[in-house]
Amino acid sequence: MLCTGSNASTIIQEQKHQQDSASADHRSTLLGLETELKKDSRSLLFSCCCLALAWAAALPRASAAARSALTLASAFTLSLASTAAFSVFSLASAYAPALLCFCETFGSLKGYEVENHMNASVTMLEEAIMYSSFSSKKRIRHSSSLTNDLIEEILSRLHSKSVARFRCVSKQCASMFASPYFKKLFQTRSSAKPSLLFAIADYGIEEDYSMKFFSSPQLENTYEKTSSTLVAAAEFHVKFSPDKSIPIYLSEDPRYVSIGYASGLIYNYCGRYVGRPLICNPNTGRYAILPYRYTYRKAYSFFGFDPIDKQYKALSLPYVDGPGRSKVLTFGAGDLTWRNIKSHTEDISYRYYEYVIVCFDVTSEKFTFVGVQKFCLLINYKGKLDVIYWEDDVDIHEICYFAKDLDEYLDENLDADATNELHVWVLEDVEKQEWSKYAYTWTDDTFFHRHLSIAGATASGEIVFSMRKYTSKQPFYVFYFNPERNTLQRVEIQGFGEAFRTTCSVRTFVNHIEDLDVNDLEQLNYIGTRR
């Protein structure tokens, strides 16, 4: 749009009038705060904080980073003012303007920058609450116009492990954090910002098998990003190192160990003669050792969550042509025992399909079957079953069950000159078994085959690929592939650190959310090492 001289002059005058009005508003605010300066030292610091917030909001031309830094400084000043006399809830009430104003500065920041700045703000809030709770024995009640609902809205932005720590601050905190309303609010907040969960297994020393859990923001609609490589920060949760007296086997070999994820919990199942299965909370490190499940031959095991009865279930299936019974273990209520169910092999027909997908209803505990033409990987794609496989010479079935070493097998069988395709089949109708089929050509498929695995799909339908191994000497990447737009976005994950002794195995899970009900599971009796 072109502007004439008179139009430009009018626009300038309007902008000047708006700036004068804003300045007048801020002068009025400052005059009002001047009155507060005469009260006491607590009001002095509080007013200084509000003054900084006012100037933070009055800098439209300043960079987002500068505004964020100023707001953080005012928030820190407010926390200092509160530690002298405020109770925990008074501190949260006073901290609310800083948090709300701080959130408003995120409009021009990228997703991963928002997460990094919010983590810093939340950390400051945690320190202020913990310090104020124990630094003063005498509490001075501070009136606040903020309601309890708004306080809960603010505190619902904390991490689950922070909520677990704050429960010991006071009975009032414990009561609020344990209420169904707050748990639902917290879960809703967490579901709106799912993350990628990384389980990194360190096998540098056989006597010290351990697994470290990290998370990073899960990006959505990455095709809108202009950068060829984005950067996301990884947050450390806990180092999981079970009791050495308990026979648990952690291995990167997919032939012997399966690691599953369901609704916030990790399931680790070992082979026939090694270890015992366990369930672990990657946020807190609490875990439960499950009863030993002996099978005559090799067995498969899977993990799922029943959203109706709110129960976790582990499924154990014997080898298809061998003896044994299918068994289910319910976790979350009652005794931890494996119980027999109808075998899945009784209704399988091999006349029409060489491969069959066995579907298990976690609620009804009944099996259904879907035939496929090729051994493939399964993911949840927008609520539908999605099977993925590569059109090349690599046999996934042979890799999983016959190859002695995955890296050695890939070196011998990958064809660097092959023009391979990624095939994606979406099950549109379960009853009729109708599929939608898609094929995508890759220009650097050897790299994907050699170093990456499919982690799953986001809610927006982007398929996430993650590197299978991590070493501190090389960067770690995840890739977001959008099938609808045929775009690929690379994201570097930073923050794993250099503490790992050797090259480590990495398992990546999508759509990880924090649930306070998971932290309250009574059957998670043990606590893993936190170092």
UniProtKB/Swiss-Prot annotation:
Alphabetized CDD domains for the sequence: F-box_AtFBW1-like
InterPro entries found in the cross-reference section: F-box-assoc_dom_typ3, F-box-assoc_interact_dom, F-box-like_dom_sf, F-box_dom
Domain F-box: 141-188
Classification via Pfam families: F-box (PF00646), FBA_3 (PF08268)
NCBIfam families: F_box_assoc_1 (TIGR01640)
Protein name per its UniProtKB record: Putative F-box protein At2g02890
Species name: Arabidopsis thaliana
